[in-house]
Structures are given as structure tokens and as C-alpha cells.
A protein has these predicted regions:
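Juxtamembrane "helix-exit" motif on the non-cytosolic side of transmembrane helices
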Residues: 1, 58-71, 146-149
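Alpha-helical transmembrane segments
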Residues: 2-16, 71-91
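Cytoplasmic juxtamembrane amphipathic helix immediately C-terminal to a transmembrane segment
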Residues: 19-35, 91-106, 186-205
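Positive-inside N-terminal membrane-insertion signal
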Residues: 31-46, 97-133
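Cytosolic-side ends of inner-membrane transmembrane helices, especially those
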Residues: 127, 139, 178-194
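Membrane-interface helix-start motif
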Residues: 147-172
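Cytoplasm-proximal transmembrane signaling helix
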Residues: 163-187
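HAMP signal relay modules and closely related sensory coiled-coil linkers
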Residues: 191-206, 211-231
Length: 231
């Protein structure tokens, strides 16, 4: 599949993602918005991750049936779709959580502290671990393919030098893509943290001035929700 023109591969992926995108709207209403606020971010992540997986499977099936690629050749495509889907699903889940935070801040109703805690440290750990695993798997696949490719090259100095530069550019491109995905995730999560911190500090400032009527709405079911519930 490495010999496939990028335009052709992009067209196949575009059609596969467009097919699942058509069904996303109704599925969001049925699977995500029909649930209570506390479950919506998790449902959003699961839905978008599975939709991305379906798109990757559709593209892989097309490559195997129509272009007669072997299963092992489409494995890298499927893993790439899974990695992209993981970061995309995290971003949409954070966006869903941000919408819930805005809605909760506007409602300003009395709420009980969350009984089931979804720890922030655990979510950080799982996200970081999964990111490292995906990055490692992609690098292993790239290096394995490049080793096979280098073994079949002419052993002249010019050929080896050109091959080394090609491998270096490939690894650099992968690292840049991963960096962009991680930075986007950090920015998205920072927006949520800013909302939670600003609301908490605003109420605490009013308390320091003697105003005890302020309340911190419970917008999440993590440590911030516990703090808000007892403030």
C-alpha cells in the first residue's frame, strides 16, 4: 500500500469518513444527548472512536476487495485511523464537556456532589498511556517497513544517503503529526480547566468579601465536581 498515490488513498479515506459522518448526527441525538450530562462526554468519545474505526474498516475492506491488497498491508491504515480517531474522539468529548459546563453555569441550580468519581489523574494516565502506545506502534510499523525497503536497495553511497534522508523525513513527519494532535488536545482541555477554575475563583473572591450567597455549579464528575459540591 506504500506505493499507492496519496491522492488515491486520500479519496478512499474521504469517502469512508463521509459515509460514517452522515450517520453521526442521528447517532449523537440517540446515543449521547439522550443520556444525563455526566455520561454524555464518555458516550461522545465512544461514539466518535467507533465511527472512526468503522471508517478505517471500510477503507481497509475496499483496499482488500477492489485493489487486492493483503490484510497485512492494510494493517497500518487501520492503526492510523485508530490513532486519529482516538485523538478526535477525545477532542469531541472535551467539547461536549465544555458545552455541559456552560449549560451548568447558566442554570445555577442546586446539585448534590457526584457520588461516582471519575478521577482526573486516571483520565490523564489512560490518555497518556494510549498516546504512547499508538506512537510506539506506528514507529515500529514504519521502521519495519523501512528496514525491508533498505535491504533491497543498491548498496552505493548515494543510494544509502538518499534512503537515510527519506527515513528521517518520514519519522519527522510522524512526530509532527503526533505533536499537532497532542497540542490540540492540550488546548482543548485547557479551555475546560479555565472555565472551571475561573468559576471557582470568582465564587471564592465573593466569599472573601463576605458574600456567602455564591454557589459553584457542579459541571463535572471529577475532583472539580467534588470541590464545587462542597463549596
Amino acid at each position: 500500500m506504500a506505493a499507492m498515490p496519496p491522492v488515491e488513498l486520500g479519496a478512499i479515506l474521504f469517502v469512508a469518513y463521509a459515509a460514517v459522518l452522515i450517520s453521526r448526527g442521528p447517532l449523537v441525538n440517540r446515543v449521547v444527548l439522550s443520556q444525563v450530562d455526566a455520561l454524555q462526554p464518555k458516550r461522545q468519545f465512544t461514539l466518535d472512536f467507533l465511527l472512526t474505526l468503522v471508517a478505517g474498516v471500510l477503507a481497509s475492506i475496499y483496499n482488500m476487495l477492489m485493489l487486492e491488497f493483503p490484510i497485512t498491508s492494510t494493517l497500518s491504515l487501520l492503526i492510523g485511523c485508530l490513532m486519529g480517531g482516538f485523538f478526535l474522539a477525545l477532542d469531541t468529548a472535551l467539547e461536549r464537556e465544555r458545552e455541559i459546563i456552560f449549560k451548568t453555569l447558566e442554570m445555577k441550580k442546586d446539585q448534590e456532589p457526584p457520588k461516582h468519581l471519575y478521577s482526573m489523574t486516571r483520565k490523564f494516565f489512560l490518555a497518556a498511556l494510549t498516546s504512547v502506545l499508538f506512537f510506539s506502534i506506528v514507529l515500529v510499523l514504519v521502521f519495519t517497513r523501512d528496514i525491508v525497503w533498505l535491504a533491497g536497495l543498491d548498496q552505493s553511497t548515494h543510494s544509502l544517503s538518499a534512503a537515510q534522508m527519506a527515513v528521517a523525513y518520514e519519522v519527522f513527519f510522524i512526530m509532527m503529526v503526533m505533536l499537532v494532535l497532542v497540542i490540540n488536545l492540550i488546548i482543548s482541555y485547557s479551555k475546560n480547566l479555565k472555565l472551571l477554575f475561573s468559576n471557582e475563583t470568582r465564587v471564592l473572591e465573593r466569599v472573601s468579601q463576605g458574600d456567602l450567597t455564591g454557589k459553584v455549579p457542579i459541571a463535572t464528575h471529577d475532583e472539580f465536581g467534588i470541590i464545587a459540591g462542597h463549596t
